[in-house]
A protein has these predicted regions:
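His/Asp/Glu-enriched, well-ordered alpha-helical/loop segment
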Residues: 1-86, 106
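Short, solvent-exposed cationic patches
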Residues: 122-133
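Short, surface-exposed, polar/charged, turn-prone segments marking secondary-structure boundaries
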Residues: 46-49, 111-115, 127-129
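C-terminal cap of metal-dependent C-N hydrolases
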Residues: 64, 76-120
Length: 133
């Protein structure tokens, strides 16, 4: 997908089940934006792609590929889920993540200092006197 964004739409039109992924640490955090770009590029190429289809490229379809669609990939009672609460349209570059839940636990809250991201590098480190970490 790096070179031809409408590839996802072309493959879907041909009957393939599309999944988007990235091996880049930055790219994996913005799969919603990658899905949006691929959706809009497909539309510009004349291929009808719905928002629901583009969202499935980064949710239900990857779960199906991994063989875990019976327990993950869609929001349904009894399924495991990691959920992001967005400030607006998840396909917009202006939308911000307000909260993130992993397996039902709040792990990030934009407005709560106790729920801010920490890297693995920071774990088990002693904070310097006077620092906030």
């Amino acid at each position: 997908m790096d070179g031809i964004q409408q590839n996802a739409a072309l493959l879907q039109q041909a009957g393939a089940r599309i999944t988007l992924h990235s091996d880049d640490p930055g790219g994996i955090q913005r799969l919603n934006q990658e899905a949006a770009k691929a959706m809009y590029d497909g539309r510009r190429a004349g291929i009808a792609v719905t928002r629901d289809q583009a969202l499935r490229w980064i949710t239900a379809n990857p779960a199906w590929v991994l063989g875990i669609d019976s327990i993950a990939g869609t929001l349904e009672p009894g399924k495991m889920a990691d959920v992001v609460v967005w400030s607006g349209d998840p396909f917009s570059v202006y939308t911000k993540a307000l909260q993130v839940y992993n397996d039902g636990w709040l792990v990030y809250d934009r407005d709560d200092p106790a729920h801010q991201p920490r890297s693995d590098f920071e774990l088990n480190q002693v904070s310097a006197p006077g620092s906030d970490r």
